Swiss-Prot record:
Pfam (any one): Ribosomal_L6
UniProt KW keywords: Ribonucleoprotein, Ribosomal protein, RNA-binding, rRNA-binding
Protein name listed in UniProt: Large ribosomal subunit protein uL6
Function, in words: This protein binds to the 23S rRNA, and is important in its secondary structure. It is located near the subunit interface in the base of the L7/L12 stalk, and near the tRNA binding site of the peptidyltransferase center.
Family from the record: Belongs to the universal ribosomal protein uL6 family.
Superkingdom, taxonomy of origin: Archaea
An example molecular function term from Gene Ontology annotations: rRNA binding
Biological source species: Pyrococcus furiosus (strain ATCC 43587 / DSM 3638 / JCM 8422 / Vc1)
Quaternary structure annotation from Swiss-Prot or TrEMBL: Part of the 50S ribosomal subunit.
GO CC terms in record: cytosolic large ribosomal subunit
HAMAP family on file: Ribosomal_uL6_A
Length: 184
């Protein structure tokens, strides 16, 4: 059963940002760079109108409404990325062995984690920059998903299994996402 006669989600395009829609591809160009993404769902139309990106569907079902709002959120994140960018902050925590972290090419190398001889590695996705400042790691970029995945890769590289995590709290943890502190 359709939920309504139609759904129409609008995303405002701010000044200095150019959005072009070609078929299912949406390109967003701004002062920090350019992002391109494909959005496809049967029956959903995406177009620009009066300085807005419009996501439209006739006689939507519940799933169609959810997908239309998801597309709108992704486009909002693309616009925010090319205007402001996204920043994640991670903190290096250790009590037993001092951890050393360095960036080498498209990988983050974590050495001496829990006294291990072999270094652990975390992949940096394309379009993301990683800076190490003492015990703080800053991950920046314009694509929210790539920045978040890179931060998660770094955090997961130091995940401890089979040991009591209440005692062995060494690792690298995300402490701030997009300017908002993470509480534990």
């Amino acid at each position: 059963m359709p939920v309504d006669a139609w759904i129409r989600e609008e995303v405002e395009i701010p000044e200095g940002v150019e959005v072009t829609v070609e078929g299912y591809k949406v390109k967003v160009k701004g002062p920090k760079g350019e992002l391109e993404r494909e959005f496809f769902w049967p029956g959903i139309q995406i177009f620009t109108e009066d300085g807005n990106v419009v996501i439209y569907k006739d006689f939507p079902r519940r799933k169609d409404v959810a997908i239309a709002r998801t597309f709108a959120a992704h486009i909002r994140n693309m616009i925010k990325g090319v205007t402001e960018g996204f920043t994640y902050k991670l903190k290096v925590v250790y009590s037993h062995f001092p951890i050393s972290v360095k960036v080498q090419g498209d990988e983050v190398i974590i050495e001496n984690f829990l006294g291990e001889k072999a270094p652990r590695k975390a992949k940096i996705l394309p379009g993301v920059t990683v800076k190490v400042r003492g015990q703080e790691i800053i991950v920046e970029g314009i694509d929210k998903e790539a920045v978040g995945q890179t931060a998660a890769n770094i955090e997961q590289a130091t995940r401890i299994t089979k040991w009591d995590r209440r005692i062995f709290q060494d690792g690298i943890y995300i402490v701030e996402k997009a300017g908002k502190p993470i509480t534990f």
